[in-house]
């Protein structure tokens, strides 16, 4: 039996209520631009060369529970990024430290959690 083709992550789709608001927030945080737009959907440019694109699907229901999947963002200056998140309407939720590895859980304006840590 032939081995199936290996898949790669082409995009990460986030459900949202405010399509334009989420495109604006995440575009500013990740410094990516809108690439394709269709009614109720937007795909952004790739997050990094060869990496996945972030995409948004407008839905009517509100976020009800903790994310089952979230983004981990790394940056040379986590405090500056977290300040930028807050300026754009996001929120710092809580900090964690395990064996010297520190990260901060944040939320976008619709409550979707993501983590911020220092680049290695």
Regions found by a protein language model. Give the residues of each.
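Amphipathic alpha-helical segments
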Residues: 18-33, 84-87
């Amino acid at each position: 039996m032939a081995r199936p083709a290996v898949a790669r992550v082409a995009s990460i789709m986030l459900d949202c209520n405010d399509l334009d608001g989420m495109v604006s927030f995440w575009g500013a945080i990740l410094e990516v631009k809108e690439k394709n737009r269709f009614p109720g959907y937007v795909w952004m440019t790739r997050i990094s060369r060869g990496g996945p694109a972030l995409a948004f699907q407008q839905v009517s229901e509100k976020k009800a529970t903790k994310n089952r999947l979230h983004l981990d963002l790394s940056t040379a200056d986590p405090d500056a990024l977290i300040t930028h998140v807050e300026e754009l309407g996001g929120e710092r939720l809580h900090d964690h430290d395990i064996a010297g590895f520190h990260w901060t859980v944040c939320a976008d304006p619709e409550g979707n959690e993501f983590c911020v840590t220092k680049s290695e």
